[in-house]
């Protein structure tokens, strides 16, 4: 067996071992009591990085996307989800969680790390958008070349400290956040991306891909929550009046 063959074999073994360690780490995270239909706050378990939220932090209507930055279907869904999160930003809580499918998308976890690293400088959504907009440019990049793509996009996204950005990509903190998101995805039965939940209910792709139908569902949820809030306010006022 040639020396080069042994080197290739060693690299493959290292990659497989790394994947096994990563999966084992996910399986050790206990998210059994976590309510995935709400904003997950920062904790030691997720690297002290809270859920990334667009829109209202206090919205009663919760839209969660489990996404993979290298996934072509996620790229296709990106314009629609951008439209929805902007249109309903005053009433909708949009949450993005990482679910990189590393078996078929070798650059997905690195891209997730780049987004999280940008997030540590307040530029998660800007980097999120760049990764999807320029997916064709970096998706097939070799492992040793992808960092240069991420650095270029980070600069465009407004990330100021590039050395910190590069260090954060490799950090335990960012890795813990991605691993935690994957544990949440596993809890929610996610096996493909994008997987979308509205108020805790999984929405099939045919439904969310129908823009008008999905917009109608979101609006109905918003209206229902507002109606429920009005009823609670009326009851509180009545109880206060009776107590006089």
Task: Describe the function of each predicted region.
Residues 64-70, 75-155, 186-188, 207, ...:
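Structural alpha/beta surface segment adjacent to cysteine/selenocysteine redox centers
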Residues 47-52, 80-81, 182-183:
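A generic local structural motif
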Residues 44-61, 86:
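A short beta-strand-turn-helix
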Residues 53-54, 138, 203:
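Short clusters of hydrophobic/aromatic residues that line enzyme substrate/ligand-binding pockets
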Residues 1-25, 152-244:
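C-terminal cap of thioredoxin/glutaredoxin-like
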């Amino acid at each position: 067996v040639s020396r080069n063959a042994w080197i290739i074999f060693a690299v493959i073994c290292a990659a497989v071992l790394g994947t096994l360690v990563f999966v084992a780490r996910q399986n050790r995270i206990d998210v059994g009591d976590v309510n995935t239909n709400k904003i997950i706050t920062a904790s030691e378990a997720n690297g002290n990085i809270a859920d990334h939220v667009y829109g209202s932090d206090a919205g009663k209507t919760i839209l969660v996307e489990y996404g993979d930055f290298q996934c072509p279907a996620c790229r296709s869904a990106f314009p629609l989800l951008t439209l929805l999160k902007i249109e309903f930003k005053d009433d909708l809580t949009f949450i993005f969680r990482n679910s990189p499918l590393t078996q078929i998308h070798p650059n997905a976890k690195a891209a997730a790390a780049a987004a999280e690293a940008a997030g540590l400088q307040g530029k998660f959504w800007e980097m999120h958008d760049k990764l999807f907009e320029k997916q064709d440019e970096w998706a097939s990049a070799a492992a040793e070349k992808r960092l240069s793509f991420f650095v270029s996009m980070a600069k465009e996204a407004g990330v100021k400290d590039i050395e910190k950005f590069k260090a954060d990509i490799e950090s335990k903190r960012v890795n813990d956040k991605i691993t935690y998101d994957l544990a949440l995805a596993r809890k929610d039965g996610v096996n493909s991306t994008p997987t979308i939940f509205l108020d805790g209910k999984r929405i099939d792709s045919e439904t969310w891909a129908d823009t008008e139908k999905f917009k109608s569902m979101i609006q109905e949820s918003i209206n229902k929550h507002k109606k429920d809030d009005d009823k609670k306010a009326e009851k509180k006022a009545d109880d206060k009046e009776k107590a006089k």
